[in-house]
Amino acid sequence: ALAAMLLLAPLLAQAQTQSPEEMIRDNIESFMSQINGKEDYYANNLDELKALVNESLNEVADFRYIGASVMGSYFRNATPEQRSRFADVFRQTLIDTYTRGLVTFDYDELRVLGQQRAQRHEDQASVDMEVVASNGQVYPVSYSLRLSDGQWRVVNVIVNGINLGLTFRNQFDQAMRDNNRDYDAV
């Protein structure tokens, strides 16, 4: 057991000291290496692609934090079961959406630009990226990350100027109002 810990320690230390930019770049490169050249295959085998997306997102996203953020002020009054159920449903919705996007969006290149802005807090970072479509149009993407348990985790994404976290929070708030604040109906 001690030998195994000694062998794993450098890998764990590397993961904990990896910069936000390196974490995003490594995750994207690893994921894309699994699907590049196999787009037609995955278009016909969506469950396999979903499994890859799930694995990739689980490595980088803080779904518990994202779920709490999307629930906003409603999070405090939700039961632990309601919080957990929402986080699971939200996570699956993101995986399904991302999977469909991978199959339908025609892109040529993904460029991680790096950490561009100074942050107010040491446990927060932003990493910018560009998605270059086949027609040459460039879509900016900005990942917001926070340091949690020694690892950088994605907590929000802004795509082409649209803040997804804020959009989902507004949708959740509206759904709660439409359903008389019934967590189970939302």
Language model features: what each stretch is:
Residues 1-2:
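Bacterial N-terminal signal peptides that target proteins for export
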Residues 8-12:
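N-terminal signal peptide c-region/cleavage motif recognized by signal peptidases
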Residues 17-98:
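Early exported N-terminus immediately downstream of N-terminal targeting peptides
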Residues 75, 92-93, 133, 160-164:
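Solvent-exposed loop/turn segments at secondary-structure junctions
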Residues 96-139:
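Surface-exposed, charged secondary-structure patches
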Residues 129, 138-144, 176-186:
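A beta-rich soluble binding module of mature secreted/lumenal proteins
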Residues 138-166:
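Short beta-strand edge/turn micro-motifs at domain boundaries
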Residues 156-186:
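Low-complexity, intrinsically disordered terminal/linker segments enriched in charged
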